[in-house]
Amino acid sequence: LLIGAIVVIAGLVFFMGGGDKSAKKSGSDSAEPIVIATHNWSSQVVMAHVIGGILESMGNNVKYVPADSQAVYESIRIGDVTLAHEVWESAFGKSFDTAREKGGVLDWGDHEARTIEDMGYPDWAAKYCPGLPDWNALKSPDCAKAFATPDSGGKGRMLEGPQSWHGDLIPQRIEALGLGDLWTVKFAGGADALWAELKAAEAEGRGTIIFNWTPNFTDGKGFTFIDFPPYYDGCRPVDGGDGKCGAPDGYLKKAVNENFPKTHPNAAEMYKKLSFNTSQIGAMAALVDEDKMTHEDAAKKWLADNKSVWEKWTK
């Protein structure tokens, strides 16, 4: 009887004292769901589910909500969304800064990957416009003609991303550089339309210039960004400049609601450590855009194949 009592007491001490450290760790986070926003490009949605999968492995509850890629930072600020994981400096930096300056949004660090977002072309299309990637090659009428489509009015067409991403930045640039008589800018409905255009142009034997970014699945396929005049602070029209400049490279940040470290301290600690590089992010996108997996299945596969990458962040 005495031995049995000792065993029971020892078991209680083990349980209450943290013998099961993983249970203790997950137990200190709130049961309220961590709300992760999803947008309209593959790496972002796959990464949302990758992060959600990591959080669920730690015992957290996760909820995914579609959100506008500009307005999401205000949603984080007021607590409707918990975190953002792909804050692209060029596209979303101003919206992020505006929300952060109001209070309620925390900068939760950068990914290892650096970003570029600009107009460019698949390497096989260079033959249609000798002189690329120098932007001056776009001044050639023959070049523009080789990039014309039925909806471009005889001009060369550039296919931008959704207008919600950058507003009229690219049309303003084309006009500022004196290319408006030869080129027109159209807006894609989403990232899928950009990738469909790549396939269509190759099949039809014409050139194509699209908006693209890195990190992305196209990193391994051969894609070149056009060398526009260098970016400098203040060169864009929104900042009072003439718009005659390309895009800078930039950060890829994480953002969280200010209460996240208080309500979910272990999750917040993991998320602070989390950092993906260019090849990892490109691989996530490729599972959807090339392998045609669903975002959810792509995330499950990435997590299963890369435990050595992410499990250390949960320790």
Regions found by a protein language model. Name each.
Residues 117-128, 249-263, 286-287:
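A bilobed periplasmic-binding-protein/Venus flytrap-type ligand-binding module shared by bacterial periplasmic
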Residues 29-43, 60-65, 155-159, 271:
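Short, well-ordered beta-strand elements
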Residues 42-61, 173-174:
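Short, polar/charged alpha-helical segment
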Residues 39-42, 60-75, 185-197:
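Short helix-initiation/N-cap motifs at beta->coil->alpha
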Residues 32, 43, 165-184, 188-205, ...:
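An extracytoplasmic/periplasmic, membrane-proximal ligand-sensing/linker region
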Residues 81-86, 157-232, 237:
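Ligand-binding pocket segment of bilobal, Venus flytrap-like solute-binding proteins
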Residues 104-159:
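A conserved helix-loop-strand patch within extracytoplasmic ligand-binding domains
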Residues 48, 67-103, 193, 217-222:
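Pocket-flanking alpha-helical
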